Amino acid sequence: MEHGLRSIPAWTLDKFIEDYLLPDTTFGADVKSAVNVVCDFLKERCFQGAAHPVRVSKVVKGGSSGKGTTLKGKSDADLVVFLNNLTSFEDQLNRRGEFIKEIKKQLYEVQHERRFRVKFEVQSSWWPNARSLSFKLSAPHLHQEVEFDVLPAFDVLGHVNTSSKPDPRIYAILIEECTSLGKDGEFSTCFTELQRNFLKQRPTKLKSLIRLVKHWYQLCKEKLGKPLPPQYALELLTVFAWEQGNGCYEFNTAQGFRTVLELVINYQHLRIYWTKYYDFQHQEVSKYLHRQLRKARPVILDPADPTGNVAGGNPEGWRRLAEEADVWLWYPCFIKKDGSRVSSWDVPTVVPVPFEQVEENWTCILL
């Protein structure tokens, strides 16, 4: 398939996505069925025999399957288990291991029940306080195995209202705990619903472009190996390119793809953030955001978690990916029918930052 994407002309990209990247209906039904089995197990059965009462407040599907950007043949799902027993971010950090241990124990026990006609293959972890439990699920009614990552989390958001921002005090507490623990981005799982909602309601064609970029990223990963920037950074870069450069339900896929690759090439200039869920209105959050946005670029802040710079800490990975992106710009997938090259959208690499109020009552702007 790599050879296919390298060699196909620009006007056939939509067909390529439809034929090779979009999951079919059987695949989608399998994943949905498997997710329902695991969710029911986690909510109704898993913690019944625990030494202390455990209450699951909700189970949220995250990752690609939650966002609606799954690639064909990738049967995996992230499930975040929100537990009322976890009462702070630090509590999640310290106690997640005990809940993962209990989930693992119950998965082993349920194998021996005849009425439970599914098989769990639990992956071993060398970490005593691992962030997640990984396992594979198979069942007679499924056409293939489905891989799961289950992550215990502190339910800091409670009921998520899609029409309004979370209380900014939540982010102030997050920032305070992350700063004191030195764990920026550690608790992004607590904001899985917001990460999912940020992408889930996007136009179908934008999700197709995200799939194409993810496929390109996987090809780069196979060729280059590690280190590379996280895939999530590329997903957010794709959303940013579309928002700034087009914003329409229908657009030229090759143009969008080229724009994303050009942003990758210009990674040293990137400073990107959104104010959908947090902004500069709360004093402590504002101070922290200004500090984050002054850091060495690239900076791409997780739209749901301001402590997570998903582009940070890996300049070598960005350099290698940028070199590969530069090579790709000369491939046929960016050539039009008349032989001319596909142009990119006009997209900035920097999102402006508002004035910062300082103690001496004068203001300065971050350039």
UniProtKB/Swiss-Prot annotation:
BP term (GO), one: innate immune response
Anything known on activity regulation? Produced as a latent enzyme which is activated by dsRNA generated during the course of viral infection. The dsRNA activator must be at least 15 nucleotides long, and no modification of the 2'-hydroxyl group is tolerated. ssRNA or dsDNA do not act as activators.
GO molecular function annotation: 2'-5'-oligoadenylate synthetase activity; ATP binding; double-stranded RNA binding; metal ion binding
Q: What post-translational modification does the entry describe? A: C-terminal prenylated.
What are its cofactors?
Mg(2+)
Annotated compartments: Cytoplasm; Mitochondrion; Nucleus; Microsome
Q: What does this protein do?
A: Interferon-induced, dsRNA-activated antiviral enzyme which plays a critical role in cellular innate antiviral response. In addition, it may also play a role in other cellular processes such as apoptosis, cell growth, differentiation and gene regulation. Synthesizes higher oligomers of 2'-5'-oligoadenylates (2-5A) from ATP which then bind to the inactive monomeric form of ribonuclease L (RNase L) leading to its dimerization and subsequent activation.
PANTHER family assigned: 2'-5'-OLIGOADENYLATE SYNTHASE 1, 2-5 OLIGOADENYLATE SYNTHETASE
Stated EC number for the protein is 2.7.7.84
- Chief place where the protein resides: cytoplasm
The identity of this protein, by name, is: 2'-5'-oligoadenylate synthase 1A
| UniProt binding sites for ATP | 64, 211, 214, 231
Explain what induces or represses this protein's expression.
Answer: Up-regulated in response to the type I interferon IFNB1, in a STAT1 and STAT2-dependent manner. Induced by polyinosinic:polycytidylic acid (poly I:C).
The record's gene field reads Oas1a
Q: Which positions bind Mg(2+)?
A: 76, 78, 149
Tissues where the protein occurs: Expressed in oocytes and granulosa cells of ovary, in intestine, stomach, spleen and uterus (at protein level). Expressed at high levels in the digestive tract and lymphoid organs. Expressed in ovary and spleen.
Keyword list, A-Z: Antiviral defense, ATP-binding, Cytoplasm, Endoplasmic reticulum, Immunity, Innate immunity, Lipoprotein, Magnesium, Metal-binding, Microsome, Mitochondrion, Nucleotide-binding, Nucleotidyltransferase, Nucleus, Prenylation, RNA-binding, Transferase
Recorded hits in Pfam families, A to Z, give: NTP_transf_2, OAS1_C
Domain of life, per UniProt, equals: Eukaryota
Q: Name one GO cellular component term.
A: mitochondrion
Record field: catalytic activity:
3 ATP = 5'-triphosphoadenylyl-(2'->5')-adenylyl-(2'->5')-adenosine + 2 diphosphate
Family membership? Belongs to the 2-5A synthase family.
Looking up SUPFAM superfamilies in the UniProt record yields: Nucleotidyltransferase, PAP/OAS1 substrate-binding domain
